[in-house]
Every structure is written in C-alpha cells, then in structure tokens.
C-alpha cells in the first residue's frame, strides 16, 4: 500500500493547512522544541590530558580507538567526543578554540560532516583532518601514523 504525504504544514490535530498563521504557529512550536532539546543535551565529553596541545574532535566510532591510545600509550593527546551532534553544543569546543589548542577533526567519512556543522555553528574551520572512508574503522596505527 503506498504512503501518501502532503507538502503542506500540519496543525495540532494532524490535518494539513495552508493557513499562514497556523504555519507560523507550528514553525515556532518546533523552534521551541529544538531550544528545549539543546538546553537539555550534554556538552561533548573531554578525554585525556587537559594540558594536551593536540586534541581530536569527533563522534561515533572514533571514540574507542582514541581512548585506547590515551589509556595505553604515552601519546599526549586529548579527545572531545560528541555523543549528540544536533543541535550542536559548542561551549567546550569554543573553550578549546580560544585556548590555542591544535584541533584535529577525526571522522569516518569523506567530507568531514561534523567539521562542516562546527564551521556553520561557530565559524571555526579545522586546519587538520583525519578522514577515513574506506569502510574500515580507524585503527590505533592510523592515528599514530597521523601523529608522526
């Protein structure tokens, strides 16, 4: 059975409308929900030496391999891990930016999606990126080779 959808706005009871006042009301309602969500989401978590100059910023599967390096080598790095990327929380990230840390974007995709979102939200553009997009996870060697 096909699914049919309208491109019009819907109102509280789920029916569609083209009424501009109702559209404005529903758009504002979604905006309030997004602000509430942002207020309740945690900041990203920082791992590693707080004095580290080189800090990786990432999300998803890069976390475990970075923590492996932090916990099992003498490599002096930090890692800022985003568990939720939208709406983006930026307070901890902006502290790192303002403290002249060397930030490295680490992502398992070709285009650096999180980096683009960070640039859109903060204006910060990563000078260094470690992107892997061959379908394989990051390995400790990938990061250690990058750091050489």
Model-derived segments and spans:
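Flexible, low-complexity linker and terminal segments
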Residues: 1-148
């Amino acid at each position: 059975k096909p699914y049919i959808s309208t491109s019009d706005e819907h109102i509280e009871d789920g029916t569609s409308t083209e009424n501009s006042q109702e559209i404005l009301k529903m758009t504002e309602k979604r905006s309030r929900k997004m602000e509430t969500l942002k207020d309740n989401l945690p900041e990203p978590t920082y791992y590693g030496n707080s004095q580290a100059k080189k800090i990786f910023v990432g999300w998803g599967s890069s976390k475990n391999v970075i923590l492996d390096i932090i916990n099992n080598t003498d490599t002096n790095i930090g890692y800022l891990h985003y568990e939720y990327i939208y709406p983006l929380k930026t307070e901890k990230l902006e502290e790192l930016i303002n403290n002249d840390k060397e930030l490295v974007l680490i992502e398992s995709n070709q285009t650096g999606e999180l980096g683009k979102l960070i640039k859109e939200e903060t204006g910060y553009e990563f000078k260094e990126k470690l992107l892997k997009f061959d379908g394989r996870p990051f390995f400790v060697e990938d990061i250690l080779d990058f750091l050489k």
